[in-house]
């Protein structure tokens, strides 16, 4: 059985294709009935079989009232196009003459993506350097993925330059010309071959003015202007020395731009401004929020210091030292430390142990005034002793130490242990 003749460069539909093979459940068949999934092989086809990064076409194969819905097309080693799908009505017989029609709108969207891929390749070489080589690609309707060799991260400025290069080439409306040439002649013309790809003696060359000239068997537009719109969605590393760009084209880009505009308008309405003034409005609100946060922190600090003063007046006398133990949940380590520093700096005889439960974790702080340290009571020793009670650990200096734990139910036990610990230190 000869290989399938591809006629899809010039035709979206043909009415004289012959069914040369039917495959059902992996076995060749004489017929394929309604509701059956399988593979149809034709002597010629307008359907593009997936290769070179471009996905296969979809569409229908018809014979009278019988319809086979094509969902994928692959090319086997023998060059036959395997049209996978399902008989949705009627039946098909081996040897029948059928009409084969691709989804032309979907093919057009794929063409946009493929032509844009060539422009992107040229843009990367122009912006990053000639060391850039294609390392893989995937072309789908109105979107593409392009892998390429490059040794470092791409800066936002470089990415913008690549995007601008592609869109400028689209706006120029460059004719897309295809030629079938002997491979040596194609190389002499300057056509770029995909790195590592094997080619026959004759190759198809796709040329876009002075921007791009590459070996390519895929389907393309006849003018770059028909790409319409191009937008890079993401860029990143996929392997050592290999990076990936994902981009959208055509209607997909238009849809995203519309969605983005709608979101801007909704955001502007929420903030009672216009989309043009949105940036300055948000900037002003962020400044206001920063000022409010600053004032709130000051109020919290003042309230905390007021609480610290009350701690000092109600401190417990233990052999000449003043002991404060307290739990204040919701305070972070920094706020707890400020409270402890105030106690230590105001009262040389202070031994303060503070605890806070925040997001399911325990933070412990111990502070000792200079007289307390001189008498042998050290903050680091206190934390080392009580943190394990809360399922944690900690330590620090004689006058200030911190620790933590995960057993929030043990905080009371940890604080209660401080009295006996100090008494043991003082003897």
Task: Tell what function each PLM region has.
Residues 1-427:
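A glycine- and charged-residue-rich anion-binding loop/surface
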């Amino acid at each position: 059985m000869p290989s399938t003749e591809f006629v899809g460069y010039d035709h979206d539909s043909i009415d004289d294709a012959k069914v040369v093979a039917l495959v059902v459940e992996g076995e060749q068949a004489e017929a394929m009935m309604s509701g059956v999934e399988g593979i149809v092989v034709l002597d010629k086809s307008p359907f593009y079989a997936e290769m070179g990064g471009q996905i296969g076409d979809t569409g229908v194969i018809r014979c009278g009232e019988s319809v086979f819905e094509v969902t994928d097309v692959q090319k086997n080693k023998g060059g036959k196009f395997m049209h996978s799908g399902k008989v949705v009505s009627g039946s098909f017989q081996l040897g029948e003459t059928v009409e084969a029609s691709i989804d032309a709108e979907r093919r057009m969207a794929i063409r946009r993506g493929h032509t844009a891929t060539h422009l992107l390749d040229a843009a990367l070489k122009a912006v990053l350097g000639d060391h850039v080589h294609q390392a893989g690609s995937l072309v789908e309707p109105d979107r593409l993925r392009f892998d390429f060799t490059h040794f470092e991260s791409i800066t936002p400025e470089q990415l913008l330059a690549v995007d601008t290069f592609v869109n400028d080439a689209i706006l120029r409306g460059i004719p897309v010309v295809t030629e079938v040439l002997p491979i040596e002649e194609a190389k002499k013309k300057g056509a770029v071959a995909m790195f590592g790809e094997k080619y026959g003696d004759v190759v198809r060359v796709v040329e876009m003015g002075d921007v791009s000239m590459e070996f390519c068997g895929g389907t393309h537009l006849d003018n770059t202007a028909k790409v319409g719109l191009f937008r890079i969605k993401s860029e990143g590393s996929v392997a050592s020395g290999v990076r990936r760009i994902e981009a959208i084209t055509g209607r997909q880009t238009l849809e995203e731009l519309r969605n983005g505009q709608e979101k801007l308008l909704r955001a502007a309405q929420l903030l009672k401004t216009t989309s043009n003034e949105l940036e300055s409005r948000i900037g002003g609100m962020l400044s206001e929020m920063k000022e409010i946060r600053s004032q709130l922190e000051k109020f919290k600090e003042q309230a905390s210091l007021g609480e610290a003063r009350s701690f000092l007046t109600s401190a417990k006398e233990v052999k000449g030292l003043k002991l404060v133990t307290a739990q204040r949940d919701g305070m972070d380590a920094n706020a707890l430390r400020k409270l402890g520093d105030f106690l230590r700096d105001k009262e040389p005889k202070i031994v303060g142990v503070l605890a806070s439960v925040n997001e399911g974790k325990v933070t412990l702080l111990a502070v000792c005034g200079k007289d307390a340290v001189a008498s042998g009571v050290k903050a680091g020793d206190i934390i080392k002793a009580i943190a394990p009670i809360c399922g944690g650990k900690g330590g620090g200096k004689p006058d200030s130490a911190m620790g933590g734990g995960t057993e929030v139910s043990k905080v009371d036990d940890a604080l209660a242990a401080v009295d006996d610990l100090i008494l043991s230190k003082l003897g």
